[in-house]
């Protein structure tokens, strides 16, 4: 009789231990990935195969940011003006200035390789807000722009990253269901072997959507141009959003889940283009006292007499391969995922999450040890 009682206790003990082990595995992951779900019950977006990430680095230039006025106060090209009226789809920002002509020039000079940088900014009253930054090294002039052996991850403004991504040509900025507050003057800066290609596009948002994300505009994030002499992505709290295509899929799924128009191919023809603006439009825009624009809170006036370019202040990309060997390799999964929930605190870092996982695992192990001791005592 005692034998059957002990066997029953033993099997109950084994079942309890197995359940604790399963709980430990789920908690140890720090998310719901063990069950194939995110915390919001949406499917996990797969990242690229590790082989597709072997040429990605966190940064190639020690986190430095060029100035949106890297070229001149005046634009290199006419300013394109587009109007977004398609309420729940994508706004496509594609200013003038194609890098293929620069690559062709390099090819004719016998240069087979180049380094490059692509950055997006939104301009305000005597200030600029970095939106996106990505660097390229050891690229081929015989291939389309961005065909490189080494790339950095895309560094993003945290708020723009939730609903924006860069198109597969590495150049166009795509914004999903933009709200009216995102109207403004956007600047794209391309630097190829130190030569800048600067181009602007004025976005006017007339149609908006019920789920368009608000609260993206923040005057405190629009920095005076003097900031960019020594500015870095760290000083701006910019984030790495993982592999570009996984980031793109995040944004598209967010739009689709909210009932937006998810077209198979995002094209620029969805935008209404009006007459182009002159090259000097940027200068007049920066000086305009329009209160609807970004306004650097530290500036007491709208004058731009003291605005100068910062070509000498940017010492980022070089042509020396040894400079890129110093940059640390990244992990294969996104460093900071793009979460759709607006309640998520931007202060939570992956390091804090790792410490929490360790503490939870230790607590579970202690409970398991107690069960083993108690079970051994009962069996004896």
Curated annotation (Swiss-Prot):
GO terms for cellular component: membrane. Gene3D superfamilies: 2.70.230.10. Signal peptide: none annotated. This is Uncharacterized protein US1141. It comes from Gallid herpesvirus 2 (strain GA) (GaHV-2). The gene is US1141.
């Amino acid at each position: 009789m005692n034998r059957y009682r002990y066997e029953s206790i033993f099997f109950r003990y084994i079942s309890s231990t197995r359940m604790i082990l399963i709980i430990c595995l789920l908690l140890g992951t720090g998310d719901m990935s063990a069950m194939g779900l995110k915390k919001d019950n949406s499917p996990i977006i797969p990242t690229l195969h590790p082989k597709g990430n072997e040429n990605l680095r966190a940064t190639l230039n020690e986190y430095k940011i060029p100035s949106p006025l890297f070229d001149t106060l005046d634009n290199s090209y006419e300013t394109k003006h587009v109007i977004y009226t398609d309420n729940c789809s994508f706004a496509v920002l594609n200013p003038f200035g194609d890098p293929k002509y620069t690559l062709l020039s390099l090819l004719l000079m016998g240069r087979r390789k180049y380094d490059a940088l692509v950055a997006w900014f939104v301009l305000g009253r005597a200030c600029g807000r970095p939106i996106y930054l990505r660097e390229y090294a050891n690229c081929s002039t015989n291939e389309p722009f961005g065909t490189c052996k080494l790339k950095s991850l895309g560094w993003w403004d945290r708020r723009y990253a939730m609903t924006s991504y860069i198109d597969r040509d590495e150049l166009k900025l795509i914004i999903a269901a933009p709200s009216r507050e995102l109207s403004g003057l956007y600047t794209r800066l391309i630097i190829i072997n130190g030569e800048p290609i600067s181009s602007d596009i004025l976005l006017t948002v007339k149609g908006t959507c019920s789920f368009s994300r608000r609260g993206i505009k923040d005057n405190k994030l629009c920095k005076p141009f003097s900031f960019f002499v020594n500015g870095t992505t760290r000083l701006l709290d910019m984030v790495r959003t993982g592999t570009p295509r996984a980031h793109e899929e995040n944004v598209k799924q967010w739009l689709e889940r909210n009932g937006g128009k998810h077209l198979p191919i995002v094209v620029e023809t969805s935008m209404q283009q009006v007459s182009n603006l002159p090259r000097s439009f940027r200068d007049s825009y920066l000086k305009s006292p329009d209160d609807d624009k970004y306004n650097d809170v530290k500036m007491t006036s709208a004058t731009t007499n003291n605005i100068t370019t910062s070509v000498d202040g940017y010492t980022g990309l070089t042509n020396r391969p040894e400079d890129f060997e110093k940059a640390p390799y990244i992990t294969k999964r996104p460093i900071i995922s793009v979460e759709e929930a607006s309640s998520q605190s931007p202060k939570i870092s992956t390091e804090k999450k790792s410490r929490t996982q360790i503490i939870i695992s230790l607590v579970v192990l202690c409970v398991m040890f107690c069960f083993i001791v108690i079970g051994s005592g009962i069996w004896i």
